[in-house]
């Protein structure tokens, strides 16, 4: 039987809760052929929201095609462009003859070819017969627009873990070429294709889109709202009732606060509770479920801390102790942080590791992973009795 608490894949329909306004905003952006970027920590529900919106558009009878690719393992710009091209070609074609026809027609005069042996051996749609230049790359980056226009149907391409393109030596080159193509097709009136960029590395995505201003006025950021705790509690109670189980509302509210309404952790936690219980679910079951979820993630958390320098660990300790300003003489002395210049370097390093981010005008530190924060507070930095 399907579990009501899904955490191993994105969810839509009855399993999707909250964020009605976010769904409405995204649907409107896509209707206006806008490019959308969503970045939130892992487990926040980014892909669930995207697919919920697309599902609702389908139900409303809207016709469109959706492609999906990941940049998770991308370490070169050319690899990204090649994968992007293959993803959009597969949107409109499905046979080697069709692939070859598209490459010959739309990429004529470039160094891209369709190699039947490469396709047979490695499922590779785009191969090259020479070193690629900017003209070659732009030709592929134009493909989504030209193919959508040729088919006469709106198309979307979901690019997951988009921030990893910036790990490539030529990442900035790819961003600039994408910007050029976006501007060119807009001037030509080819507004029938949209990107949906998704990123789980919050600081890396902000660096691309906000600090360095790539895709300025070309991509709209959709910041996900927090799912209301009451909606989560109701969803969990109904989920347990469906299997004849009862759980105290206050206990679930406490779990929501512990996980800071992170839907991945909450669904994992309640799924474990479900597997451990029959009938009325008491507090010991929740404690056992919490211990199980922590045990699953403990190795990852230890590895994260082992990867930090002593200074970085000290700054994390200061955050757990409740400090938000770290350049004062008191905090520098208490946590042996050396100097305010060193504090700046430590903050930058922890942001690059995607452990921290800083929000608001006062730059309040936020630990991005709520379970990691709980583990730090209650295990790693636990005060001696």
Enumerate the language-model features and the residues they cover.
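Walker B catalytic acidic pair
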Residues: 160-162
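A short, basic N-terminal segment
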Residues: 1-41, 56-59, 371, 382-385
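Alpha-helical DNA-recognition elements
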Residues: 56, 272, 349-352
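A short helix-turn-beta junction within AAA+ P-loop NTPase domains corresponding to the substrate/partner-engaging
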Residues: 209-225
